[in-house]
């Protein structure tokens, strides 16, 4: 089902690395902030933007334009969401692991990824250990969907949503191993996550893999 996801002009610029080797699982976990789900889950897949296959078919096409990175990233996201939706339809659970990018150069070497392939996100799949937690509250639709033109941030609506998230976090504290501050509400979460998501090596890595040079 995941492979049936929509693909930009059928370029199908995605590959999945299924990690079955226990030693490799442990290594990937260590490179991903030691998130235990990677070792514990029944299945662990890594979704990659992959233009290596297309490059072999059309070797004379210049893939250094950033548009190709956008295409591969978008396609990989669709496929990853389809995979989780299919798993949940069978009574399974899952969690995405964005932390695989924290040491992306070493991960690329461990997975033997060639040029024009980059690992974007991991997905752990398995039977939930306990009762499935409720979905995190989402931003109200008025803040994410606009008619005809972009709308400025509504501070009052944001404050209401932030309070909803404060109540949510009281019952389910943030437990990310690399959280840099105590998260009480959504605004705290944004400040925390943006701060720890700085990966200054990423552009150099992307260039090395043949992406985003133009």
Can you say where each PLM-predicted feature lies in the sequence?
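Acidic, surface-exposed loops and disordered segments
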Residues: 3-214
């Amino acid at each position: 089902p995941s492979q049936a996801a929509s693909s930009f002009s059928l370029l199908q610029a995605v590959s999945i690395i299924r990690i079955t080797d226990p030693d490799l699982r442990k290594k990937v976990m260590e490179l991903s902030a030691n998130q235990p789900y990677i070792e514990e889950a029944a299945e662990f897949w890594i979704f990659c933007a992959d233009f290596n296959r297309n490059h072999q078919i059309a070797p004379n096409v210049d893939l250094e334009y950033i548009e190709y990175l956008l295409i591969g990233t978008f396609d990989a996201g669709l496929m990853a969401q389809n995979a989780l939706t299919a798993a949940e339809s069978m009574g399974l659970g899952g969690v995405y692991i964005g932390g695989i990018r924290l040491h992306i150069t070493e991960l690329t070497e461990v997975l033997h990824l060639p040029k024009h392939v980059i690992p974007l996100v991991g997905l752990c799949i398995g039977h939930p250990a306990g009762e499935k937690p409720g979905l995190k509250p989402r931003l109200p639709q008025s803040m994410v969907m606009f008619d005809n033109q972009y709308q400025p941030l509504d501070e009052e609506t944001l404050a209401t949503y932030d309070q909803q998230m404060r109540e949510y976090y009281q019952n389910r504290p943030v437990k990310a191993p690399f959280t840099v501050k105590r998260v009480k509400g959504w605004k705290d979460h944004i400040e925390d996550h943006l701060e720890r998501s700085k990966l200054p090596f990423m552009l150099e890595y992307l260039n090395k893999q043949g992406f985003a040079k133009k």
